[in-house]
UniProtKB/Swiss-Prot annotation:
Functional note: Component of the ubiquinol-cytochrome c reductase complex (complex III or cytochrome b-c1 complex) that is part of the mitochondrial respiratory chain. The b-c1 complex mediates electron transfer from ubiquinol to cytochrome c. Contributes to the generation of a proton gradient across the mitochondrial membrane that is then used for ATP synthesis.
Keyword set, alphabetical order: Electron transport, Heme, Iron, Membrane, Metal-binding, Mitochondrion, Mitochondrion inner membrane, Respiratory chain, Transmembrane, Transmembrane helix, Transport, Ubiquinone
Protein name: Cytochrome b
Positions bound to heme b b562: H83, H182
Subcellular location, record wording: Mitochondrion inner membrane
Main location, first listed in the record: mitochondrion
Amino acid sequence: MINLRKTHPLMKIINHSFIDLPAPSNISAWWNFGSLLGACLIIQILTGFFLAMHYTSDTLTAFSSVAHICRDVNYGWLIRNLHANGASMFFMCLFLHIGRGIYYGSYLYKETWNIGVILLLTVMATAFVGYVLPWGQMSFWGTTVITNLLSAIPYIGTTLAEWIWGGFAVDKATLTRFFAFHFILPFIIMALAMVHLLFLHETGSNNPTGINPDSDKIPFHPYYTIKDALGMTLLLLVLLLLALFSPDSLGDPDNFSPANPLNTPPHIKPEWYFLFAYAILRSIPNKLGGVLALLASILILLIMPLLHTANQRSMMFRPVSQTLFWILAADLITLTWVGGQPVEQPYIIIGQLASMLYFLLILILMPLAGMFENYMLKPKW
């Protein structure tokens, strides 16, 4: 009898994607984050589904419905904490996954990379609309500040902002539609993730050396299934430690107060995973300029393949590029820290310098480093 997994139309797809898939023999732990992101997405959809059963998207009852989930629903506190901290784990994995792609030159798989950038934007949109739902002070004011940025767009800005709000300010209509968006977007993310994998499987995985691995492939199962299982166990361990021991450490204390349009919190700031972009936005004194810089900070990833000047794909054997890469990582951590600080000196100047360095590194210094390394590798005799 021929093996069912190789003949059945549905099983065949699963088989070619997760079982008999030829994979490079040398991919490191940095290649675990793709599967971890898949795990995060499933955790978020499941916990979100159970939260949606008890949540009400109305300005009068949203805050108390979240309190009701935590107090009266069986394990509601756990479901909510897993969902809130699951978002942080999701972004942690996302940033490491993108960092891996930059370090090892995975962006040269252009279709996979571009779908990945679209995925990043979709996940950011989902997290943003989700943060509004508990209807706490930071939910309300964070949404007000960020959606207000649309009004910086010339001519159509104000109309656009009011269209998104469903009125003249963030209110009941905004909350209801954001709940609808927050419910539908994860399924769009799931579909995009499948397209992401489809494009990846057209070329096969990259590997740490950046050299074509076709001559030395191993089956995905059991080697990488067990490796992914280990990664998922560690992810779950960290998530449970967060959710059970310090569930509120990554949140904002202001969000324990119900939304009040008449009282502005002293420091309006988004969740930690948006702080780097928020710092770039704030570093430009002009509203429209800030919005453009904010967009550029993410969309710059799309031109990454065009900025690749090195003859080698990976940074594994390129010490100059490696140094710049880790400076970029440190710069992003600096931006994240600055984004959470009040708008005063010395944070303003640090934020402006870090923002300049971010664009300088990606657009000029890293391409120059690639050219320099090419020159250094040329025989000089």
